[in-house]
Amino acid sequence: MRVDLFDFDLPPERIALRPVEPRDASRLLVVRPDSGDMTDHGMRELPDFLRAGDVLVVNDTRVIPARLHGFRSRGESRAKIEATLHKREGEALWRAFVKPAKKLRVGETICFARQEPGTEVESLEAEVLEKGAEGEVVLGFNRAGAALDAALDLLGEMPLPPYIAGKRAPDSQDSLDYQTLFANRSGAVAAPTASLHFTPRLIAAIEARGVTICKVTLHVGAGTFLPVKAEDTDAHRMHAEWGEVSAEVAAFLNKVHAAGGRIIAAGTTSLRLLESAVDEDGLIQPFQGETSIFMTPGFRFRAVDILLTNFHLPRSTLFMLVCAFAGLETMRRAYAHAIAASYRFYSYGDACLLFRATRNTSTGAAL
């Protein structure tokens, strides 16, 4: 399909730079493609659209402070380096985007440290093991596993998306705001943002409806923010991300479907993982590994019935995903409504609850 079909104009003031407080005070647009219904609600009303026997699947990945500031030394000269980790390759290995990258050489060491008033914390070092295109390198750190994670927590910054970081610097509040209540397994460099709306109060209300909450893991990579540069979706190559669906969770989800319950994915990351794990017969299998699944209109969804998600960028793979799930025409209308009604967009913005389209809704007029 032509990528320009997924383009739309978004006023800059619709981009949320901070989340609402409390988290469940965000707005919720409910979209039912088959009936054409589109209604405005609040996030606290989410339980009203769920029923006993349903299951809500959340992503328990934890965002690491993946943006590091340091320097490389060459003789007596020093050059500042910024590195954004985006994919773990081993206990002490990470792929990263660095800048400036042009003069950085394989074999050089980058020293990362945070300067505190009157002191300098213990530094972290990484050797450049490989150098690729567009500023990508492989870094080998002098710490591994939990010790490396602890150093990143101390020295790193939250890797805010470019549409936020381009307008303000990350701060200590982002360390709280850009982490979900379900965060447990470290490895993501972007938050599964649909779950940022949950509070203990909202979780309790959902469980009181007889809805079970299940956890899966997908370590969200920086590729989630990469623009689609191709003119046709067939020419786009999707980034890979590591995920896991345990045998216990897979068996439970299949049991829910067999009993007539619905699977609600909290976020596109949960949906992408479940649709990577499902077989041709609609049974979800245990899964552990990388997925580069790419969904555009015409994709056949087998696992997920309802999707909770934020509002996404134009021409992005995530907007293509929601168009595949609920229909292109439906989502173009929904986004036009959201813009006109002053919904807040992107990671810190509002949410929409999408019921899966069961008929062909893949064509539509301009937004």
Curated annotation (Swiss-Prot):
It comes from Beijerinckia indica subsp. indica (strain ATCC 9039 / DSM 1715 / NCIMB 8712). Pfam families: Queuosine_synth. Belongs to the QueA family. It is found in: Cytoplasm. GO terms for cellular component: cytoplasm. This is S-adenosylmethionine:tRNA ribosyltransferase-isomerase. Monomer. It is an enzyme of class 2 (transferase). Its EC number is 2.4.99.17. InterPro entries: QueA, QueA_dom1, QueA_dom2, QueA_sf. Pathway: tRNA modification; tRNA-queuosine biosynthesis. Coiled coil: none annotated. The gene is queA. Transfers and isomerizes the ribose moiety from AdoMet to the 7-aminomethyl group of 7-deazaguanine (preQ1-tRNA) to give epoxyqueuosine (oQ-tRNA). It comes from the Bacteria. NCBIfam families: PRK00147.1, queA. GO terms for biological process: queuosine biosynthetic process; tRNA wobble guanine modification. It catalyses: 7-aminomethyl-7-carbaguanosine(34) in tRNA + S-adenosyl-L-methionine = epoxyqueuosine(34) in tRNA + adenine + L-methionine + 2 H(+). GO terms for molecular function: S-adenosylmethionine:tRNA ribosyltransferase-isomerase activity. Keywords: Cytoplasm, Queuosine biosynthesis, S-adenosyl-L-methionine, Transferase.
